[in-house]
């Protein structure tokens, strides 16, 4: 007689019980947090966390100062100043990472458009970005999308308004931060981010195999849903 054996399933309650019984050393968690703060350049938070947890950072926190200045400039929209500081720290970085340089130049163009400096934006695009657009289809597409903002009286409300959001500046800063850390042969991705990517990969593998399991659906809040 043949029969189909029902696969093992685990409920959310069972899963949560297993998680609650799993012992993770507080020091290990603290090291993950410190690693994140240092990698992302949060010096003040890292200093305070060192005092509270007793965990020493893997690098001298004073070495974060220049990255912090670059971050502040980019998040304020001071792109040309950020480029100048990057060049003073690592003169070859933007020469060897042309996409990063393009994205910084693109962000400067976005800032000109934000300030409604239309003529300056068009001149900058023609003199500084056109050549890269000719060399790369990807750059051309991004440049066209950016210039499309000029077609709207209120570009913030246009289909391309996301370029004017703070998240766009944050995106550029994250790219710069990773490039600088890579250039300095430092860890450029926080260990916590790697663990979250591993979690997403594992869940995707289970989904592909049609496995029913308690799934984390919101990483920011740690929301776990019942198996479906």
Swiss-Prot record:
Disulfide feature: none
Location in the cell: Cytoplasm; Nucleus
Regions annotated as coiled coil: none
Pfam families given in the database record: CTLH, LisH
GO annotation, biological process: positive regulation of canonical Wnt signaling pathway; positive regulation of cell population proliferation; proteasome-mediated ubiquitin-dependent protein catabolic process; Wnt signaling pathway
InterPro entries: CRA_dom, CTLH/CRA, CTLH_C, LisH, Ubq-SigPath_Reg
SMART domains attached to this UniProt entry: CRA, CTLH, LisH
Start and end residues of each LisH domain: 25-57
GO annotation, cellular component aspect: cell junction; cytoplasm; cytosol; nucleoplasm; nucleus; ubiquitin ligase complex
Function of the protein: Core component of the CTLH E3 ubiquitin-protein ligase complex that selectively accepts ubiquitin from UBE2H and mediates ubiquitination and subsequent proteasomal degradation of the transcription factor HBP1. Acts as a positive regulator of Wnt signaling pathway by promoting beta-catenin (CTNNB1) nuclear accumulation.
Subunit architecture: Homodimer; may also form higher oligomers. Identified in the CTLH complex that contains GID4, RANBP9 and/or RANBP10, MKLN1, MAEA, RMND5A (or alternatively its paralog RMND5B), GID8, ARMC8, WDR26 and YPEL5. Within this complex, MAEA, RMND5A (or alternatively its paralog RMND5B), GID8, WDR26, and RANBP9 and/or RANBP10 form the catalytic core, while GID4, MKLN1, ARMC8 and YPEL5 have ancillary roles. Interacts with RANBP9. Part of a complex consisting of RANBP9, MKLN1 and GID8. Interacts with CTNNB1, AXIN1 and GSK3B.
Name recorded for this polypeptide: Glucose-induced degradation protein 8 homolog
Organism: Bos taurus
Gene name, Swiss-Prot/TrEMBL: GID8
């Amino acid at each position: 007689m043949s029969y189909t054996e029902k696969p093992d399933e685990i409920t959310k309650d069972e899963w949560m019980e297993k998680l609650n019984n799993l012992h993770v050393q507080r020091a290990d968690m603290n090291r993950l947090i410190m690693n994140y703060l240092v990698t992302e350049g949060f010096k003040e938070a890292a200093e305070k966390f060192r005092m509270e947890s007793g965990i020493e950072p893997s690098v001298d926190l004073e070495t974060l100062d220049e990255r912090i200045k670059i971050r502040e400039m980019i998040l304020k929209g001071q792109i040309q100043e950020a480029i100048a500081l990057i060049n003073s720290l690592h003169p070859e970085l933007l020469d060897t990472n042309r996409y990063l340089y393009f994205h910084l130049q693109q962000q400067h163009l976005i800032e000109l458009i934000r300030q409604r400096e239309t003529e300056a934006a068009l001149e900058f695009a023609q003199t500084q970005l056109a050549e890269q657009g000719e060399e790369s289809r990807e750059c051309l597409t991004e440049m066209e999308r950016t210039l499309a903002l000029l077609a709207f009286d209120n570009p913030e409300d246009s289909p391309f308004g996301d370029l004017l959001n703070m998240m766009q500046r944050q995106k550029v800063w994250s790219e710069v931060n990773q490039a600088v850390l890579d250039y300095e042969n430092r860890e450029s991705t926080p260990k916590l981010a790697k663990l979250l990517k591993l979690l997403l990969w594992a869940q995707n593998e289970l989904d592909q195999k049609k496995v029913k399991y308690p799934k984390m659906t919101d990483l920011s809040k740690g929301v776990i849903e019942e198996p479906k």
